[in-house]
C-alpha cells in the first residue's frame, strides 16, 4: 500500500480497500479497537479461571487493527488453529501438533471460558472479525478485486474471500503454492491449488530476482513435493553465487547492504547481538536498535558544534548521556519547550560544561555503546 501511494502519488483516502482481510472486516463491521481482545484481557481471563492462559499478540496492520496472531500459550494456539481450519478443538488436539504435554480438560475449560468472557464483556477476537464479516453479508460490491498471497489463507479466510468475490465482476487471485510455508499456522494451500481448475490461469514464468544457481537449488527441493501445481519458472540471466556457512560469524558483512532471514524471532536476536559486537548497523522490525536514540543525540550534538540550534527535545535526549561533570541538569528545567538553543547559550545559561566531540562528551552513554556507534558512523 505505501509503495502504491508513493509510486502513483496517492493518499490513504484514495485506497480505502487496499488492506488486509482483518482490516476490511474491522472497518465494515464498524468496530472500535477497545472492542477487540487485548493482552490484558487474556491475563484477566487466566486470573478468573485460576491458571495462567498466557498472552496473545497481534502484529498490527497499518491502521492498527492487527493481523497475524501469535501466543506463548499452546492452549490458545489450538483454539486459534481449530477456528482457522474450521474444525473442533477436539480434532485439532488429536492432530498432536502442539509441543507441550497439555490437558484436554484444561483446553476445554479455556475454550468455554474464553467464549463466556467475550460474551460477558462484549469483546471479539480477530477470528471473530472474519467469521462475523462472512455471516454479515457486508462485503462491498467491486468491479475488480485482487487477493494477494492467497496460498497463505486459512479455510476460514477462504470463506471470507469467497463472500467478497461472489459480489465482484472480476476476481484475480494471486499466489504461489511453492511459497506456501504457513500450513503449520492454519494456511490451506489445497484450496488455492484447487482454483486452477476453476479459473483462467495467468502464470508468471520469468523471475526477475532469482539467479540461476539459487534457482537450481530451489527447484531441486521443490520438485520433491508431489501435490503441487506444475509450472514453468525461469531464473534471471545472471549466474549468481551460492555459499554455505555453518555460523553467522563466518560471514563477512562489512561491505554493502545485507538481508538476513531466520526461522524464528529469537534467532534474529542472537544474530543482532553478533552484528552489534562487530559494530555493524542493523534494523530489525521486531526490536528497536539499541543505539537509535544515541545515534540521534550524537548527530544533533555534532550539528550543534557546527552552529545549528537544538530543540528542547534534542537537548533532553543529549543531556541523558552526560553526567553531572559535563552538564548541571537542574538548569534545564528553566528552558522553554518550544524554543531552540545554541550550544554557547546552553553553556552560559543552562549548565552545559563541555564542548567537545560527542564520544568524549557523552560520559554516561556506556563505553560499549560508544564503541559500537563509532564503528557504525
Model-flagged regions — what are they?
Residues 1-34, 216-219:
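P-loop NTPase Walker
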Residues 7, 156-164, 271-274:
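A short acidic, amphipathic alpha-helical/loop segment
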Residues 10-15, 29-44, 53, 140, ...:
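Short, polar/flexible loop-turn hinges at active-site or ligand-entry regions and domain interfaces
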Residues 23, 212-215, 265-377:
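Core RecA-like ATPase module of SF1/SF2 helicases and allied nucleic-acid translocases
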Residues 56-146, 155-160, 173, 183:
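Accessory N-terminal region flanking or inserted into the helicase ATPase core
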Residues 143-145, 171, 253-262, 377:
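Generic beta-sheet signal
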Residues 158-244:
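Conserved RecA-like helicase ATPase core segment
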Residues 241-256:
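Conserved interdomain hinge at the start of the Helicase C-terminal
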Amino acid at each position: 500500500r505505501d509503495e502504491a501511494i508513493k509510486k502513483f502519488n496517492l493518499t490513504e483516502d484514495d485506497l480505502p480497500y487496499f488492506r488486509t482481510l482483518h482490516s476490511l472486516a474491522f472497518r465494515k463491521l464498524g468496530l472500535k479497537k477497545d472492542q477487540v481482545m487485548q493482552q490484558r484481557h487474556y491475563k484477566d481471563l487466566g486470573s478468573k479461571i485460576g491458571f495462567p492462559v498466557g498472552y496473545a499478540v497481534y502484529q498490527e496492520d497499518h491502521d492498527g487493527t492487527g493481523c497475524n496472531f501469535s501466543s506463548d500459550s499452546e492452549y490458545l494456539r489450538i483454539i486459534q488453529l481449530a477456528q482457522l481450519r474450521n474444525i473442533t478443538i477436539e480434532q485439532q488436539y488429536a492432530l498432536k501438533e502442539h509441543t507441550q504435554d497439555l490437558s484436554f480438560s484444561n483446553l476445554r475449560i479455556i475454550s468455554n471460558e474464553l467464549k463466556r468472557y467475550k460474551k460477558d464483556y462484549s469483546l471479539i477476537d480477530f477470528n471473530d472479525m472474519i467469521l462475523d464479516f462472512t455471516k454479515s453479508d457486508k462485503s462491498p460490491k467491486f468491479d475488480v478485486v485482487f487477493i494477494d498471497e492467497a496460498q497463505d489463507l486459512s479455510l476460514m479466510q477462504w470463506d471470507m474471500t469467497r463472500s467478497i468475490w461472489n459480489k465482484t465482476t472480476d476476481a484475480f487471485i494471486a499466489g504461489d503454492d511453492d511459497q506456501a510455508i504457513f500450513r503449520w499456522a492454519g494456511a490451506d494451500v489445497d484450496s488455492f491449488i484447487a482454483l486452477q481448475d476453476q479459473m483462467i490461469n495467468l502464470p508468471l514464468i520469468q523471475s526477475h530476482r532469482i539467479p540461476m544457481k539459487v534457482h537450481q537449488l530451489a527447484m531441486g527441493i521443490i520438485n520433491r513435493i508431489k501435490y503441487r501445481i506444475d509450472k514453468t519458472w525461469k531464473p534471471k540471466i545472471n549466474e549468481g553465487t551460492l555459499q554455505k556457512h555453518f555460523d553467522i560469524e563466518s560471514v563477512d558483512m562489512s561491505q554493502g547492504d545485507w538481508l538476513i532471514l531466520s526461522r524464528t524471532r529469537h534467532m534474529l536476536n542472537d544474530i543482532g547481538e553478533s552484528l552489534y559486537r562487530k559494530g555493524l548497523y542493523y534494523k530489525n522490525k521486531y526490536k528497536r536498535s539499541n543505539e537509535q536514540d544515541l545515534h540521534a543525540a550524537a548527530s544533533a550534538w555534532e550539528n550543534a558544534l557546527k552552529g545549528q540550534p537544538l530543540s528542547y527535545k534534542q537537548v533532553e535526549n543529549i543531556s541523558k548521556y552526560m553526567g553531572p561533570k559535563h552538564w548541571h541538569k537542574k538548569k534545564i528545567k528553566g528552558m522553554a519547550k518550544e524554543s531552540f538553543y545554541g550550544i554557547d547559550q546552553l553553556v552560559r545559561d543552562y549548565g552545559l560544561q563541555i564542548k567537545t566531540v560527542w564520544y568524549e562528551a557523552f560520559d554516561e552513554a556506556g563505553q560499549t555503546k560508544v564503541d559500537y556507534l563509532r564503528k557504525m558512523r
